[in-house]
Amino acid sequence: MPPFSHVPVLADAVVAGAEHLPHHNGVLIDATLGGGGHSALLLERFPGLRLIGLDQDPTARAAAAERLAAFADRVEILATNFASYTPPAPVLMVLADLGVSSPQLDVAERGFSFRLDGPLDMRMNPGSDGETAAELIDRLEENALADLIYGYGEERLSRRIARRIKADLAAQGPYEGTAALAYAVAGCYPPKARRGRIHPATRTFQALRIAVNDELAVLDRLLQQAPDWLETGGVMGVISFHSLEDRRVKTAFLQDERLERITRKPTVATDDEQNRNPRSRSAKWRLARRVNGC
């Protein structure tokens, strides 16, 4: 398999979402291009669509360019974060898949994985000069770190975990890598709780990743800006993977006068898809339409 092999989640729901468009001759913005899986399906299904794909991860952009080579004359890939982008003209559809892709999780050097040992980094753009996860946990005081782990990870043991992390740093210096941090977090759980389907470090790693990449603030900017990108009748679809994201998307689609909800309740993966692709278990798809006069 190629180094950035990635199975798009809720693919049928995304393609079905494009059926709500008033026509299919215009621009699709994939705000989180990744490996290009969703975009490839949409370009194949709707020959009149043209793609502007945004991603700050150079590995993802290279993989997407390869995957979308058959549609090269209809594709533009930009090295940017969706929060800092504005399209030159109204577009038909905006798509965002908010999850960390499997290839990013499966490459130890990226520092996202608690199962594979790697540097404690977690930056979506590893070439940036932004703060790494290692620098973040070193900088924060114990109470602030606990608040972060609770607020962004919804981790009920956040105080105990923050205390353990700061004690480790004081006693032995920086963690050698992600495995050492994951081991420390797991040690804060009772032995029986360490054997569940969900790894004990999942919520803590989620919290650190969100903080390092300012993910919720970036999502808020997308939800504020993207409706203005759409032509009347155009649609915006978002795939979220945890409740912090989904609540924001749900609230924006419900309260934004520029939008009309198409999905009243989120679409989730079928049992079959969840069995084939465990990553899809927590995925939720919401879709809204741009309305006129706002």
Swiss-Prot record:
- List the Gene Ontology MF annotations in alphabetical order: rRNA (cytosine-N4-)-methyltransferase activity
Q: Broadest EC class?
A: transferase
GO term, biological process aspect, one? rRNA base methylation
What EC number(s) is this enzyme filed under? 2.1.1.199
Superkingdom to which the source organism belongs: Bacteria
Similarity remark:
Belongs to the methyltransferase superfamily. RsmH family.
Described by its record, this protein's role is as follows: Specifically methylates the N4 position of cytidine in position 1402 (C1402) of 16S rRNA.
What is the name attached to this protein's record? Answer: Ribosomal RNA small subunit methyltransferase H
- This chain's source organism reads Synechococcus sp. (strain CC9902)
